Design a protein with these regions (language model features):
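Hydrophobic secretory-pathway targeting helix
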Residues: 1-38
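Cytoplasmic C-terminal tails of single-pass
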Residues: 200-207
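Selective detector of the "anchor" transmembrane alpha-helix that sits immediately C-terminal
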Residues: 171-200
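Short, aromatic-rich amphipathic segments at membrane interfaces
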Residues: 150-180
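Soluble mature domains adjacent to a membrane tether on cell-surface and organelle-surface proteins
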Residues: 25-161
């Protein structure tokens, strides 16, 4: 999705926030999700911070892969779907702040991204590039001292049959998320007013 489209989607989410907050529970997973999906290993809080920096490169490499199997494609698809559920990683603190209402869903898409990267180590055409990314991640983690950092979601495994949603009901308790969504809602409202004013003279002149 292009940046403008993502901004519009964020603004729409912000405008619908009261409805979302009223109808979702803490880190609610999709109702009725089966347990027949593929399990995705947990990711530590420290790993998240580094893998988030390499996510675009990992997904781009995976998307170009030709000789893939169904499990790989399912995990890749889950990583991208979960990323959109987590507002494309745009919410402040979603990766680094354990208290963020978006932290668990960030764990989900980054755990899936890591699983995709690990799978590419065994793929003939992608193995070299995947190995280079893994080495860079290992170096970054050691340099930043993130290897042993954990949080409440660090031991949580995920499943491709279950989408992790943000904890909308906790957004008002998280200042950074609340400020971001409030600002986007205000921007969306202002854009609507400007659009109406631009159209009004044209409508009057056509009468």
């Amino acid at each position: 999705m292009r940046p403008i489209g993502r901004l519009a989607a964020l603004a729409l989410i912000a405008s619908l926030f009261p409805l979302l907050a009223g109808n979702t529970s803490a880190h609610e997973r999709r109702a009725g999700g089966s347990h027949t999906g593929l399990e995705i290993p947990a990711i530590s809080h420290g790993e998240m911070a580094v893998i988030a920096d390499y996510r675009g490169e990992i997904i781009a490499l995976a998307s170009r892969a030709v000789d893939t199997n169904e499990p790989f494609r399912r995990v890749l698809n889950y990583a991208e779907i979960q990323y959109s559920y987590c507002v494309w990683g745009r919410m402040p603190g979603s990766v680094t702040d354990e208290e963020s209402p978006f932290n668990e869903c960030a764990h989900a898409y980054l755990a899936a991204t890591k699983a995709v990267l690990m799978a590419m180590r065994e793929m003939p055409r992608e193995a070299t590039a995947a190995g280079e990314i893994i080495s860079a991640i290992d170096i970054d983690m050691a340099r930043r001292g993130l290897a042993l950092i954990t949080c409440q979601f660090s031991g949580e495994a995920f499943n491709t049959a279950q989408v992790v949603k943000p904890n909308w009901s906790r957004v008002p308790l998280h200042p950074a998320s609340m400020a971001s969504l409030t600002g986007l809602a205000a921007l969306f409202g202002l854009a609507g007013l400007v659009f109406r004013r631009v159209l009004r003279p044209k409508a009057q002149s056509s009468e």
